[in-house]
A protein has these predicted regions:
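Acidic-and-aromatic substrate-binding clefts and catalytic sites of carbohydrate-active enzymes
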Residues: 23, 40-52, 71-81, 151-159, ...
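Gly/Pro-rich active-site loop or hairpin
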Residues: 47, 77, 115-121, 125, ...
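Active-site acidic/histidine proton-transfer and metal-coordination neighborhood
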Residues: 79-176
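N-terminal pre-domain/capping segments
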Residues: 1-88
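Conserved, mostly hydrophobic/aromatic
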Residues: 36, 98, 143, 179, ...
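Acidic (Asp/Glu)-rich catalytic clusters
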Residues: 25-31, 48-65, 81-96, 133-138, ...
Length: 281
């Protein structure tokens, strides 16, 4: 069944991030996986092993692109060279939708290579929405933006993070990649109620979920993607699914990566929540 009515996104089931340590296992064993998510920037090249592996993956699996450097929240214009390379990859993968983060990370052509939070103001929402529309029109593929984990806030913010996310996606007429772990991490770092966040996101625009693990330090939590998903995050995920219906879900595991079997097993834990929601849909 459709994940929701927005932009014709469909439920792809449960996906896994395509990572280098698993290349050989996937190509040789051809495990049963609903889809793979790739980091777009890792494949925006003219040749080499990454593209060769990607082409082999595309012969067997569905692939969705996830970006880390569009920087829709930066004040400067979109990087046209980046968009051109991204479009070549879009045509190669035939990705049904494309995701990137609602953040900033560039100033005057210099890049932090980080996903930094934006001030939650109406002016910032207008800038981000305009850039999302421009990217979508150029790439000719639906776009969904992801909420980032954050460790600092701006005094000038005029609304909550979930209100800002809603404002941006309504203005841009785009989808949401709802990262449930990021909501949990930010809620613990900033002291807001993650349930309130889940309950106020426009459910009809949620095109995809991210779930992941994190690391707890003495005074804060860091979104490290190097542990299994904890129970409170699964509970938030289930609550979100009750609002969205069955929706494409992706497990991220990017550091201290275990065997493919262990990552796959962790991802498949989402199935019981998807099936429970499907029964009542």
């Amino acid at each position: 069944m459709p994940a929701n009515a927005f932009n014709g996104f469909t439920d792809y089931g449960i996906g896994i991030g395509l990572r280098v340590p698993h290349y050989n296992h996937i190509l040789s064993e051809k495990p049963t996986v609903d889809w793979f998510e790739i980091i777009s920037e890792n494949f925006m090249c003219d040749g080499g092993r990454p593209l060769k592996v990607l082409d082999q993956i595309l012969e067997q699996y569905r692939v969705v692109q996830h970006g880390v450097s569009a920087y829709f929240g930066s004040a400067e214009p979109l990087n046209r060279e980046h968009l051109k390379k991204l479009k070549r990859l879009v045509l190669r993968t035939n990705t049904p939708w494309l995701t990137d983060h609602l953040c900033w990370g560039s100033v005057d052509g210099r890049y932090t290579h980080d996903l930094l939070p934006v001030p939650y103001t109406f002016a910032a929402a207008r800038v981000a929405a305009a850039k999302i529309r421009q990217a979508r029109d150029f790439l000719e593929v639906p776009i969904a933006v992801e909420n980032v984990s954050s460790y600092a806030e701006f005094h000038v913010s005029e609304m909550t993070e979930w209100e800002f996310l809603s404002e941006v996606v309504e203005r841009a007429d785009c989808g949401i990649l709802l990262d449930v772990n990021n909501i949990y991490v930010s809620s613990r770092n900033h002291g807001f109620d993650p349930v309130e966040y889940i309950d106020h996101v426009p459910a009809g625009r949620v095109a995809q979920f991210h779930i992941a693990g994190h690391t707890r330090f003495r005074k804060y939590i860091l979104d490290t993607h190097d542990h299994p998903v904890i129970d409170p995050v699964w509970q938030l995920y289930e609550r979100a699914l009750r609002r969205t219906g069955p929706t494409a879900t992706l497990l991220e595991w990017d550091a201290r990566i275990p065997s493919f079997a262990e990552v796959h097993h962790e991802a498949l834990k989402a199935r019981r929540f998807l099936e429970k929601v499907a029964v009542h849909a």
